[in-house]
């Protein structure tokens, strides 16, 4: 909920084509310079208290070569291919059409968080760029806060740019030195790596050791790292590279040119290798550079929250509540218990497999008596909820088979009494937290989502932890691609409904 709007000032800058544009943070400590270089490529740099944070870096995108006017049976002539080559270019050949600056200052209240109110104060530069060779326009919007920079690309609706596919995003972040970095390997499917602390120049040599086994992983480069990336410079600056407002777009990783110390955005591809399907008018997420000479200010920064879209769930504050919970899962991870009800089945077909005819393995952790023990512990020790994994049929062959119909999210094992557990938890003042492991079969989860959420409502579950262990189905998609990011938001929207 936004409130206390203090000042909005807009200034249209008279300009000479491709002249430098300077933007200063409200406190004057950060200065960003934008210009179009001699190749017509947009560039920017960033300085904090006289120290270089980002050296001159180019911006832009490369589109996939395609011609929507042709069919697969049309004859393609070489001259047409040359035209298509030029149409993929959204990274140079630009001239500045106009530039506008503005100032914004407000306080707003988050749904929940560490602070009751957050200040959103920045100076903005919006640069409208025109590309004569393709008769196209894009806008790059910069917002400079006291603690860092955010920028994004915006694509107005226009005759020469309607539907397009992103092949690569070429947002660069040129470092001013061989900084110390706190990094994990760039990967399209997992962030479950231990952090490595090293110089940027050492990333390549340490990458092989840093990539440890995981249930689903797709590392992409010997110098690729994930955001948020934290760095420390030799002259006492702390720099964080990340993104905000990630909606209908792929997650951004960073690929390092370790000869020149230049990071470039690296988007997660889809099953076809494409990195984003776009329709104008639209825009990318924000790319963020948080900077301070005090490490504590990086943690205190609210740039990401300020650049995220406002909450669109009108009554969220009335039902979104943080909780402390414990759960039935760690004894399975340590091998003392199991998610599976029986050891007799190597293959399960939901609706056909009859668990009443199988022998229990005696170590199934998600049983009524054991869950009651956890409820008692939660009630005695100040916890709000109990999560139970392995409660529903299908865990005997849930992983590693690329199985589509793996769970139905509503059928409990014979030893898990849903009604009794809810009654007992309520008598102790404890909420039960639902667990929906999808085994990364996202298509199956979306088919069952309405029934699964209604099952929760009918049985007193007010929250859900969803899991996506394994390789994504539809096969070839990745955990951090555009398709999956849209799924995560779809799940949140359905839960709110």
Locate each region found by the language model:
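Structured core elements
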Residues: 152, 287, 327, 387, ...
């Amino acid at each position: 909920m936004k409130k206390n709007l203090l000042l909005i000032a807009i200034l249209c800058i008279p300009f000479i084509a491709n002249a430098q544009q300077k933007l200063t943070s409200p406190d004057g400590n950060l200065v960003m310079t934008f210009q179009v270089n001699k190749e017509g490529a947009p560039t920017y740099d960033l300085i904090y208290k006289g120290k270089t944070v980002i050296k001159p870096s180019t911006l832009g995108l490369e589109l996939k070569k395609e011609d929507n006017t042709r069919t697969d049976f049309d004859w393609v002539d070489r001259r047409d291919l040359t035209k298509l080559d030029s149409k993929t270019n959204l990274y140079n050949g630009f001239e500045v059409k106009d530039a506008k600056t503005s100032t914004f200052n407000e306080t707003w209240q988050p749904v929940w968080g560490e602070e009751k109110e957050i200040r959103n104060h920045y100076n903005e530069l919006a640069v409208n760029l025109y590309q004569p060779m393709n008769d196209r326009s894009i806008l790059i919007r910069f917002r400079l806060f006291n603690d860092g920079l955010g920028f994004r690309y915006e694509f107005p609706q226009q005759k020469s740019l309607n539907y397009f596919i992103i092949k690569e995003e070429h947002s660069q972040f040129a470092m001013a030195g061989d900084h110390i970095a706190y990094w994990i390997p760039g990967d399209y499917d997992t962030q479950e790596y231990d952090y490595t602390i090293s110089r940027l120049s050492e990333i390549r040599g340490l990458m092989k050791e840093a990539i440890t086994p995981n249930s689903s992983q797709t590392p992409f480069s010997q110098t690729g790292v994930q955001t948020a990336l934290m760095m420390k410079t030799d002259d006492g600056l702390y720099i964080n590279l990340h993104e905000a407002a990630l909606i209908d777009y792929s997650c951004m990783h960073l690929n390092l040119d370790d000869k020149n110390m230049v990071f470039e955005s690296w988007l997660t591809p889809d099953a076809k290798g494409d990195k984003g399907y776009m329709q104008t008018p639209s825009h990318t997420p924000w790319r963020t550079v948080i900077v301070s000479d005090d490490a504590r200010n990086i943690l205190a920064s609210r740039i990401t929250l300020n650049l995220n879209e406002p909450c669109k769930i009108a009554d969220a504050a009335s039902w979104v509540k943080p909780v402390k919970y414990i759960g039935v899962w760690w004894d399975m991870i340590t091998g003392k218990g199991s998610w599976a009800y029986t050891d007799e089945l190597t293959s399960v077909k939901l609706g056909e497999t009859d668990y009443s005819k199988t022998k229990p393995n005696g170590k199934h952790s998600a049983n009524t008596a054991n869950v009651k023990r956890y409820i008692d512990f939660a009630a005695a020790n100040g916890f709000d909820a109990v999560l139970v994994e392995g409660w529903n049929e299908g865990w005997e062959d849930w992983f590693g088979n690329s199985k589509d119909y793996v769970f139905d999210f509503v059928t409990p094992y014979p030893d898990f009494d849903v009604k009794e557990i809810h009654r007992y938890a309520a008598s102790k003042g404890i909420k039960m937290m639902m667990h929906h492991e999808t085994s990364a079969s996202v298509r199956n989860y979306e088919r069952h989502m309405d029934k699964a959420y209604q099952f929760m409502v009918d049985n007193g579950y007010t929250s859900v932890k969803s899991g996506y262990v394994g390789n994504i189905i539809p096969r070839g998609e990745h955990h951090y691609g555009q398709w999956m990011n849209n799924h995560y938001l779809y799940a949140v929207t359905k839960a709110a409904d």
